[in-house]
Curated annotation (Swiss-Prot):
Keywords: Cytoplasm, Hydrolase, Nuclease, Ribosome biogenesis
Protein name: Putative pre-16S rRNA nuclease
Catalytic EC class: hydrolase
Domain of life of the source: Bacteria
InterPro entries: RNaseH-like_sf (IPR012337), YqgF (IPR005227), YqgF/RNaseH-like_dom (IPR006641), YqgF/RNaseH-like_dom_sf (IPR037027)
Compartments (UniProt record): Cytoplasm
Function, as annotated: Could be a nuclease involved in processing of the 5'-end of pre-16S rRNA.
Pfam families: RuvX (PF03652)
GO molecular function: nuclease activity
GO cellular component, one term: cytoplasm
A GO BP annotation: rRNA 5'-end processing
Organism of this sequence: Listeria monocytogenes serovar 1/2a (strain ATCC BAA-679 / EGD-e)
EC number: 3.1.-.-
Family membership noted in the UniProt record: Belongs to the YqgF nuclease family.
Amino acid sequence: MRIMGLDVGSKTVGVAISDPLGWTAQGVETIQIDENRKQFGYDRVKELVLEYEVEKVVVGLPKNMNNTIGPRAESSKIYAEVLEARIGLPVVLWDERLTTSAAERTLIEADVSRKKRKEVIDKLAAVMILQSYLDTTN
Protein backbone atom coordinates (compact mmCIF):
# COMPACT_ATOMS: atom_id res chain seq x y z
CA MET A 1 0.00 0.00 0.00
CA ARG A 2 1.58 3.27 -1.09
CA ILE A 3 1.12 6.39 1.00
CA MET A 4 1.72 9.96 -0.16
CA GLY A 5 3.19 12.65 2.07
CA LEU A 6 2.63 16.36 1.43
CA ASP A 7 4.35 19.43 2.83
CA VAL A 8 1.91 22.24 2.01
CA GLY A 9 3.24 25.80 1.94
CA SER A 10 1.94 29.07 0.56
CA LYS A 11 3.94 28.74 -2.69
CA THR A 12 4.75 25.04 -3.04
CA VAL A 13 3.63 21.55 -2.09
CA GLY A 14 6.41 19.05 -1.52
CA VAL A 15 5.44 15.48 -2.49
CA ALA A 16 6.83 12.17 -1.23
CA ILE A 17 5.67 8.59 -1.86
CA SER A 18 6.26 5.45 0.19
CA ASP A 19 7.59 2.24 -1.26
CA PRO A 20 4.88 -0.42 -1.91
CA LEU A 21 5.46 -1.99 1.53
CA GLY A 22 5.11 1.34 3.32
CA TRP A 23 8.56 1.30 4.92
CA THR A 24 10.47 4.14 3.26
CA ALA A 25 9.61 7.55 1.82
CA GLN A 26 11.10 8.98 -1.37
CA GLY A 27 10.77 12.52 -2.68
CA VAL A 28 8.84 12.84 -5.93
CA GLU A 29 8.47 16.51 -6.84
CA THR A 30 7.62 20.01 -5.73
CA ILE A 31 4.36 21.44 -7.07
CA GLN A 32 4.19 25.21 -7.56
CA ILE A 33 0.99 26.76 -6.14
CA ASP A 34 -0.37 30.28 -5.72
CA GLU A 35 -2.73 30.87 -2.80
CA ASN A 36 -3.60 34.37 -4.03
CA ARG A 37 -4.82 32.99 -7.37
CA LYS A 38 -6.53 30.00 -5.73
CA GLN A 39 -4.22 27.58 -7.56
CA PHE A 40 -3.49 24.78 -5.11
CA GLY A 41 -2.15 21.95 -7.27
CA TYR A 42 -4.99 19.54 -6.45
CA ASP A 43 -5.13 18.23 -10.02
CA ARG A 44 -1.41 17.40 -10.03
CA VAL A 45 -1.70 15.68 -6.65
CA LYS A 46 -4.58 13.61 -8.02
CA GLU A 47 -2.50 12.65 -11.08
CA LEU A 48 0.30 11.46 -8.78
CA VAL A 49 -2.19 9.57 -6.59
CA LEU A 50 -3.36 7.65 -9.66
CA GLU A 51 0.14 7.18 -11.11
CA TYR A 52 1.55 5.72 -7.88
CA GLU A 53 -1.66 3.92 -6.85
CA VAL A 54 -1.74 5.76 -3.53
CA GLU A 55 -4.25 4.57 -0.92
CA LYS A 56 -3.76 7.25 1.75
CA VAL A 57 -2.34 10.78 1.96
CA VAL A 58 -0.51 12.32 4.92
CA VAL A 59 -0.51 16.13 5.07
CA GLY A 60 1.93 17.87 7.39
CA LEU A 61 0.29 19.98 10.11
CA PRO A 62 2.68 22.78 11.15
CA LYS A 63 1.62 23.26 14.77
CA ASN A 64 3.22 25.98 16.85
CA MET A 65 5.84 24.88 19.38
CA ASN A 66 3.26 25.28 22.19
CA ASN A 67 0.98 22.81 20.35
CA THR A 68 -1.49 25.47 19.18
CA ILE A 69 -2.86 25.79 15.66
CA GLY A 70 -1.80 28.96 13.83
CA PRO A 71 -2.78 30.37 10.42
CA ARG A 72 -0.42 28.10 8.45
CA ALA A 73 -1.80 25.00 10.20
CA GLU A 74 -5.36 26.19 9.53
CA SER A 75 -4.48 26.46 5.83
CA SER A 76 -3.07 22.92 5.89
CA LYS A 77 -6.25 21.61 7.52
CA ILE A 78 -8.40 23.22 4.83
CA TYR A 79 -6.08 21.87 2.12
CA ALA A 80 -6.43 18.36 3.57
CA GLU A 81 -10.23 18.59 3.73
CA VAL A 82 -10.55 19.79 0.13
CA LEU A 83 -8.04 17.22 -1.10
CA GLU A 84 -9.88 14.37 0.64
CA ALA A 85 -13.13 15.42 -1.05
CA ARG A 86 -11.43 15.65 -4.45
CA ILE A 87 -9.52 12.36 -4.43
CA GLY A 88 -11.88 10.21 -2.37
CA LEU A 89 -9.09 8.76 -0.23
CA PRO A 90 -8.35 9.11 3.48
CA VAL A 91 -6.20 12.15 4.28
CA VAL A 92 -4.42 12.21 7.64
CA LEU A 93 -2.95 15.30 9.29
CA TRP A 94 0.50 14.68 10.82
CA ASP A 95 2.42 16.94 13.21
CA GLU A 96 5.31 18.35 11.21
CA ARG A 97 6.88 20.78 13.65
CA LEU A 98 10.41 21.69 12.58
CA THR A 99 10.54 19.41 9.51
CA THR A 100 11.37 22.29 7.15
CA SER A 101 14.10 23.45 9.57
CA ALA A 102 15.46 19.91 9.80
CA ALA A 103 15.35 19.56 6.01
CA GLU A 104 17.26 22.81 5.56
CA ARG A 105 19.85 21.77 8.15
CA THR A 106 20.33 18.44 6.36
CA LEU A 107 20.84 20.18 3.02
CA ILE A 108 23.28 22.72 4.49
CA GLU A 109 25.29 19.92 6.11
CA ALA A 110 25.39 18.20 2.71
CA ASP A 111 26.83 21.44 1.26
CA VAL A 112 23.89 21.94 -1.12
CA SER A 113 23.87 25.42 -2.68
CA ARG A 114 21.23 27.93 -1.58
CA LYS A 115 19.59 27.84 -5.03
CA LYS A 116 19.39 24.03 -5.07
CA ARG A 117 18.14 23.98 -1.43
CA LYS A 118 15.25 26.22 -2.43
CA GLU A 119 14.34 23.77 -5.20
CA VAL A 120 14.31 20.63 -3.04
CA ILE A 121 13.56 21.70 0.54
CA ASP A 122 9.79 21.17 0.38
CA LYS A 123 10.21 17.76 -1.24
CA LEU A 124 12.67 16.76 1.51
CA ALA A 125 10.28 18.09 4.18
CA ALA A 126 7.53 15.91 2.63
CA VAL A 127 9.88 12.92 2.87
CA MET A 128 10.51 13.68 6.56
CA ILE A 129 6.79 14.04 7.29
CA LEU A 130 5.95 10.78 5.53
CA GLN A 131 8.89 8.87 7.04
CA SER A 132 7.85 10.01 10.52
CA TYR A 133 4.33 8.75 9.84
CA LEU A 134 5.61 5.41 8.48
CA ASP A 135 8.00 4.91 11.40
CA THR A 136 5.22 5.57 13.92
CA THR A 137 2.52 3.46 12.28
CA ASN A 138 4.58 0.41 11.21
